[in-house]
Amino acid sequence: MQPNDITFFQRFQDDILAGRKTITIRDESESHFKTGDVLRVGRFEDDGYFCTIEVTATSTVTLDTLTEKHAQQENMTLPELKKVIADIYPGQTQFYVIEFKCL
C-alpha cells in the first residue's frame, strides 16, 4: 500500500470529495508542496486513503490576512476559519495556502 502524501481531519473529507473545500492552510512543515503536485490524501485519524488531489496554486498568508475568500474555499465563515487555524496551530501566525482539486 502506498503512503499518503497529505492528511486531513476526517470531518473535512465530505467537503473535499464534494468540492466544497478547495484549499488547505498549513504551517511551515508542509510548505514544500508545489503547483502540479499530485498527492494521495488520507484521513489524519487513521491515515485511510480517500482521494487524490492536484495542487493548483500555493501562496503564503498570515492569520491577520485571511479573507472571506479563504473562508469560502474552506467552506467556513471567516471567524470559524481563524478559530480552526488558531486551534490547530496555536501561537503561529505565518501559514501556507495550498489550493487543490480532486482528480
From Swiss-Prot:
What is the active site of this protein? K21 (proton acceptor), T24 (nucleophile), E74 (proton donor)
According to the UniProt entry, where is the signal peptide? none
**Listed GO CC annotations:** cytosol
Top-rank taxon: Bacteria
State which Enzyme Commission number(s) the record gives. 3.5.1.135
Which Gene Ontology molecular-function terms are recorded?
hydrolase activity, acting on carbon-nitrogen (but not peptide) bonds, in linear amidines; N4-acetylcytidine amidohydrolase activity
Residue intervals of the ASCH domain = 6-101
Catalyzed reactions: N(4)-acetylcytidine + H2O = cytidine + acetate + H(+); N(4)-acetyl-2'-deoxycytidine + H2O = 2'-deoxycytidine + acetate + H(+); N(4)-acetylcytosine + H2O = cytosine + acetate + H(+)
Keyword set includes Hydrolase: yes
Q: What is this protein called?
A: N(4)-acetylcytidine amidohydrolase
Q: What does this protein do?
A: Catalyzes the hydrolysis of N(4)-acetylcytidine (ac4C).
CDD domains per the UniProt record, alphabetical: ASCH_yqfb_like
Sequence similarity: Belongs to the N(4)-acetylcytidine amidohydrolase family.
Tell me the keywords, alphabetical order.
Answer: Hydrolase
